[in-house]
Amino acid sequence: MGTDNQTWVSEFILLGLSSDWDTRVSLFVLFLVMYVVTVLGNCLIVLLIRLDSRLHTPMYFFLTNLSLVDVSYATSVVPQLLAHFLAEHKAIPFQSCAAQLFFSLALGGIEFVLLAVMAYDRYVAVCDALRYSAIMHGGLCARLAITSWVSGFISSPVQTAITFQLPMCRNKFIDHISCELLAVVRLACVDTSSNEVTIMVSSIVLLMTPFCLVLLSYIQIISTILKIQSREGRKKAFHTCASHLTVVALCYGVAIFTYIQPHSSPSVLQEKLFSVFYAILTPMLNPMIYSLRNKEVKGAWQKLLWKFSGLTSKLAT
């Protein structure tokens, strides 16, 4: 293959979801509202946990980390997507595309590991409740959170580097909403088997391994719940895990379907829809899931609103 055919591109063109102007404007309004709700919801969860001493527990410490990851992931994708909805020239510089891929891979990896850590926390809370405080002490929680963040940022630069060293042969049109891994790899004009193997290995390490740990944790949790004699006790134990289990199903389900088998990957349209779901819907839904299904969080919201209304009344008088 000639050198001329392997010319590096300086920018990419993201084809996005639609070329129709009216559709793009409608999507801009919809995604802008969803992004604002995502940022506000996750930031309010972090603020609520910070302000309410009753929520200063390992579970909510990890939830704080999850909210930070969610809002960061959405921010790595959505602002650029919104700008391109209204732009005629949907270009993204090479460096910006690489940075977007780096952060999306890193934050995705962090989330998968963090969800496994949260499953372990729920396992200890249900299966070893008497020793919960002794096991899940502050030092261990901090180390588990740091491990989650480090694991994502270790694998991401490797995956990003081997992806963007592929010759693109002047092919700069990315048929996606962002610089997503599989979409960028498809631009290469050389054999990408080694990249697909790397994607598979990375998926096993950062996706399937945490997922298996989650499954093992919940097998033990369910086994313990079934041994509880009282119906009220079983109900309380189940509600302890319900919110996390819902989030696990949302996050792992989409990622496994997209990445675990590159050779039989979904269609381009499905990939775009999965990316929208993962980058916008999931971060927006997570705070709602934890708020609506958790009595402690709902109680903290009521307490905060009561304080806020009291402060407003004082200022008004």
From Swiss-Prot:
Its main location: membrane. GO terms for biological process: detection of chemical stimulus involved in sensory perception of smell; signal transduction. GO terms for molecular function: G protein-coupled receptor activity; olfactory receptor activity. Glycans are attached at residue 5. It is found in: Cell membrane. It comes from the Eukaryota. PROSITE patterns: G_PROTEIN_RECEP_F1_1, G_PROTEIN_RECEP_F1_2. The chain crosses the membrane at residues 25-48, 58-79, 101-120, 140-160, 201-222, 237-261, 273-292. Disulfide bonds join 97-189. Pfam families: 7tm_4. Residues 49-57, 121-139, 223-236, 293-317 are cytoplasmic. Keywords: Cell membrane, Disulfide bond, G-protein coupled receptor, Glycoprotein, Membrane, Olfaction, Receptor, Sensory transduction, Transducer, Transmembrane, Transmembrane helix. GO terms for cellular component: plasma membrane. Belongs to the G-protein coupled receptor 1 family. Odorant receptor. This is Olfactory receptor 2F1. It comes from Homo sapiens.
